[in-house]
UniProtKB/Swiss-Prot annotation:
Gene Ontology, cellular component aspect: intracellular membrane-bounded organelle
Superkingdom, natural source: Eukaryota
Protein's name in the database: Pyridoxal-dependent decarboxylase domain-containing protein 1
GO biological process, one term: carboxylic acid metabolic process
Keyword Lyase: yes
Organism classification: Eukaryota, Metazoa, Chordata, Craniata, Vertebrata
Region (Disordered) residue spans: 659-751
Family named by the database record: Belongs to the group II decarboxylase family.
Entry keyword set: Decarboxylase, Lyase, Pyridoxal phosphate
């Protein structure tokens, strides 16, 4: 067993896949329907290789591989294998062994987290412990609950109280599993005037409990937080415990801040959790241990009720859940456990100290001296006002825009500094914030001090970009509104300069055709803007955005020339619109010209046939007649003049073309301006070293774009796609001619 486990870890963590031939076979077959089991079975290495292929799929990047779990993680994984192995022992020996494992683990956890005279329940789902505690409390208050069920609750309906800052869906899950109506759940609001906005309002809780008791209900249990899921704040546990004692309620505490109980110095607010009736711990993420169970510590004197509630079990196999944690705690030792929790707390303090020095960053922490969770948010309060006035109150939806900016900030920090473990959190009062909770991520990711320093460095680079983008956003809106052909799209969820749409000036089209033209123009305009040499990011917007056929402009720089940017978008849009009209008109004119040329050539062929007679149409006879009496005239080709829109004979084309070539000068100058190497577009003069050229970049773009359109128009005129094959030989488009020596061939011969 040990060899198999060692082989498994080596294969799954090595990152080395099978040979190239095996890779090709896997790409072709692993997603197909599996075949039957092999009769002689497979070896362990082959099975583990299959597991690895299913885990990684078609991912080629090493970053998607399973992270290295370390030696302590190997001990936790070994515990699951040992649990399966131990379960086949003799029943009496199994009972003694599981009792020892359970008692040892319970004793160690109670001492580590300062929870005296407690019992432990190990469970996979971190909500299951609270669910069992609720059953225990219901069995305590309702003696006939185990036999009569819900009818025993009819005399006094139970009430479960939870904070509004608890994790979403927790109370609903409890009611669903216990068979209670949602009316038995009471959500207590948080403070609104005094104290933390994420702490339960104790005075309001007292009032709610009194009202429920007066109405004949039974206050059953209170769920408090020692570290809310969002901001990491701790409720006033001492005051809540007093209320629970007063009204005979059970107090249950959960949260990430409970991990700090293992430290030598703990805040008094968290220390009060040791007096609660039960608490749920999640040592897996705190210590970086994969697949270890959560633990609920509780105090209760009646073991029969605990057994009825499912907190204890008479089955020895159930007690083996504690085995992975039993092995891991021994491997780490007391000092190793304390060191990991202490390291995570120090990372939080390090980040908090650096955030105090950054402008435009607001933090939301409960205790600046000891806060395991750091929540911060970009704010414009310290930003300089724009040219149009102060940012404060200068636009509607200010909160939504800042939320979008902070969402972008959190995503960028998580992408560029992945070892920091930051994520985006939505808080009811503060809005969208960035959260750093090393107690939940540092042990698994291996976060160190240099990762926090890199996080602060990236944050310092992004703050000026956010500030100037926020200032220029209103200026961009004003510039766009001054252009008749541009529409400003108000998208408060877009973290960038703004959203714009080019509107064609044609009004004689129906709505469907107009929408198609808007889509085509804005799509081509977006492609042209993305090809420009600029620091701005142009895109079509988020995948599920409500606004379609728009151009989304991303984060701006300090030296951005908004007027030049809008003028460039306007000029490029007009050129694309005019070129579209030119191509449409040209296609119609060419089509009519080809039809008229066909009629003229058909008429000329009929006249020629009448003049020559039928005998000249016979191959052998025509040769004899042509030798005695040569043909004097032939059908002349037709040339279509795009400039004048008329059909002419090809006879004078050659002489006119030759004269035009003589008059053309090969050295005629062309107006073609170029930017200096490294120069960026949309830079204000004097803003940086790139602003060197005196020529407007808009004129440069117009000139280069018109040259491209001219070449496209020439290609379209020379080879019209709608022309039949026989017309390609008979009709010369624009300035194409048929040489004199080839005019003797008739249309029928060419066909």
């Amino acid at each position: 067993m040990g060899n198999h486990l060692s082989d498994a870890m080596k294969i799954l963590e090595s990152g080395k896949l099978e040979t190239e031939q095996g890779q090709e076979g896997r790409k072709m077959s692993w997603k197909e329907i599996p075949g039957p089991l092999q009769g002689d079975g497979q070896d362990v290495v082959s099975i583990l290789q299959l597991v690895q292929n299913l885990m990684h799929g078609d991912d080629e990047e090493q970053g998607h591989r399973m992270q290295f779990v370390g030696e302590q993680g190997h001990m936790a994984l070994l515990g699951h294998s040992l649990a399966a192995y131990i379960s086949v022992l003799e029943r009496e020996r199994l009972r003694k062994l599981t009792t020892r494992i359970l008692s040892d683990t319970t004793l160690w956890l109670c001492r580590l987290f300062r929870y005296e005279n407690g019992s432990a329940y190990f469970h996979e789902d971190d909500r299951e412990g609270l669910l069992k505690v609720c059953r225990l409390v219901m069995n305590t208050h309702y003696e006939d609950f185990t036999t009569e069920g819900f009818t025993a609750l009819s005399s006094k309906h139970p009430v479960i109280y939870q904070s509004a800052a608890c994790r979403p869906g927790l109370g609903q899950h409890l009611c669903s599993q216990l068979g209670l109506p949602l009316s038995c759940l009471c959500v207590v609001p948080c403070n609104t005037m005094f104290g933390s906005l994420h702490q339960m309002d104790v005075a309001l809780l007292d009032k709610l409990v009194k009202d429920d008791r007066d109405s004949g209900k039974l206050p059953l249990l209170l769920i408090a937080n020692a570290g809310t899921p969002g901001a990491g704040h701790t409720d006033k546990l001492s005051r809540l415990k007093e209320l629970c004692v007063q009204y005979n309620m059970w107090l249950h505490v959960e949260g990430v801040n409970l991990a700090t109980l293992v430290l030598g110095q703990v805040s008094s607010t968290v220390t009060a959790a040791t007096k609660c009736d039960s608490m749920t711990l999640t040592p897996g993420p705190w210590l970086g241990l994969p697949a270890v169970p959560a633990v609920t510590l509780y105090r209760h004197e009646d073991p029969a009720l605990s057994l009825a509630a499912g907190l204890t079990s008479s089955q020895p196999v159930e007690k083996l859940r504690a085995l992975p944690l039993w092995l891991s705690l021994q491997y780490l030792g007391h000092d190793g456990i304390v060191e990991r929790i202490k390291h995570a707390s120090q990372l939080s303090q390090q980040l908090l100290e650096h955030l105090k020095t950054l402008a435009s960053i607001k933090t939301s922490v409960e205790d600046e001296l000891n806060s395991p969770v750091v929540v911060f948010r970009f704010s414009h309060e310290n930003s300089a006002p724009s040219s149009g006035g102060s940012v404060e109150g200068s636009y509607a939806g200010e909160r939504d825009i800042l939320d979008a900016f902070n969402r972008w900030l959190g995503d960028q920090l998580a992408e560029q500094v992945p070892l920091s473990g930051v994520d985006v959190v939505e808080l009811e009062d503060e809005g969208t914030c960035v959260r750093f909770s090393p107690l939940m991520t540092a042990a698994a990711l291996g976060t160190q001090e240099n990762d926090v320093a890199a996080l602060v460095e990236k944050l310092a680079e992004m703050i000026p970009l956010l500030c100037c983008t926020l200032r220029l956003r209103q200026d961009f809106r004003d510039e766009v509104l001054q252009q008749a052909s541009l529409s400003y799209i108000e998208d408060l969820n877009w973290p960038g300069l703004g959203v714009v749409r080019f509107e064609p000036r044609t009004t004689d089209l129906d709505e469907d055709k107009r929408q198609d033209r808007v889509e085509k123009i804005n799509s081509d305009l977006l492609k042209k803007l993305m090809e420009l040499d600029t620091d701005l990011n142009f895109s079509g917007g988020p995948e599920f955005s409500e606004e379609k056929n728009c151009i989304f402009i991303g984060i701006a720089t300090e030296d951005l020339d908004v007027a030049e940017l809008v003028e460039t978008i306007m000029s490029l849009g007009r050129d694309i619109e005019e070129s579209g009209k030119l191509f449409e008109n040209m296609t119609e004119v060419v089509r009519k010209g080809i039809q008229e040329a066909e009629l003229q050539l058909q008429k000329a062929n009929e006249e020629k046939l009448m003049e020559e007679g039928v005998l000249r149409q016979i191959p052998l006879v025509s040769s004899v007649l042509n030798w005695f009496s040569p043909v004097q005239a032939s059908v002349k080709g037709r040339t279509f003049n795009l400039a004048e829109g008329c059909l002419d004979s090809t006879e004078p084309v050659y002489s006119i073309k030759a004269q035009m070539r003589k008059e053309d000068s090969p050295d005629s100058p062309k107006a073609n301006t170029r930017r200096f190497p490294g120069q960026k577009l949309f830079r204000r003069p004097g803003a940086g070293s790139d602003s060197i050229s005196e020529t407007s970049s808009v004129s440069q773009l117009e000139e280069s774009f018109r040259e491209t359109l001219h070449s496209q128009a020439a290609d379209e005129a020379e080879v019209p796609q709608e022309r039949p094959a026989h017309i390609l030989e008979e009709t010369a488009i624009a300035d194409q001619r048929v040489p004199e020596g080839q005019e003797a061939e008739s249309v029928e011969t060419i066909r």
